[in-house]
Amino acid sequence: MTAQRRPTPHSSIWNSSMRKTLLRAACMAALTFMLSGCGIIDYFYLPPPEDTAQELYESGNDAMREKDYVAAAQAYTRLKDNYPFSPYTIEAELSLADAYFLDEEYPAAAEAYKEFETLHPRHQAIPYVLYQVGMARLKSFISVDRPVNNVQEAYQYFQRLRESYPGTEYAAKAEEHMKECRRLLAERELFIADVYWRTGKYGAAWQRYSFVRDNFKDVPHAVEYATEKANVAYLRHREAQSENIREAREGSWKQWFKWL
């Protein structure tokens, strides 16, 4: 009969130590998995950290240098909306208007420049802002057969700039654009007068031509054309009136004879 081998004290101690080591390793593995799991959860379910005001400002400036004006406008808008009191915000507001202007989004540019003036009426860039509003409105002009409210507003802003900031470089530029606005407004009036002329409405045409002759003396070619057309339109208008009177008289006699 074979005797059973009894465990020695050394083997018992070793087994106990081994169990503790394995348990410790298992705990570390579980902790590592949990931490990595939290990282995965954060990655997929938590929103990414927002860009700082400085990062958004620099991103917008980089996009402007690359002439990616849409991306620039987006960056400046995020900065303006998320960090309204940042030291970068004022410059971002003006740069946003510039981005719209350079992207030829002239109505949006005009509104952005106007908003800047409203928020910062004493800012040193106001002469530039007034000039840019005028330019944005002027560039919105399409043709003389469309409403010219944008041209009228452009003229008003250029005039404000010239009167309020006469010594600035932008006031000198505004002077030339005011002449352009006056020319376009005169041509608009002549276009309407010509429509009346072509449709035989000589009285209305004469009034429009006369208006240009009397109110646009700073546009010589328009005054010359309007004066010539006004004279002829007036004569034709009087002729038409005389013809109407004659027809009315003849018509009354015809009616009288029919009654007899």
Swiss-Prot record:
Stored Gene3D superfamilies: Tetratricopeptide repeat domain
Domain of life according to the entry: Bacteria
Family annotation (SUPFAM superfamilies): TPR-like
Main location: membrane
GO cellular component, one term: cell outer membrane
Keywords: Cell outer membrane, Membrane, Signal
Signal sequence region: 1-37
Subcellular location: Cell outer membrane
Subunit composition and interactions: Part of the Bam complex.
Family the UniProt entry places it in: Belongs to the BamD family.
Purpose of the protein: Part of the outer membrane protein assembly complex, which is involved in assembly and insertion of beta-barrel proteins into the outer membrane.
HAMAP family, A to Z: OM_assembly_BamD
Protein name per Swiss-Prot or TrEMBL: Outer membrane protein assembly factor BamD
Lineage of source species: Bacteria, Pseudomonadati, Thermodesulfobacteriota, Desulfovibrionia, Desulfovibrionales
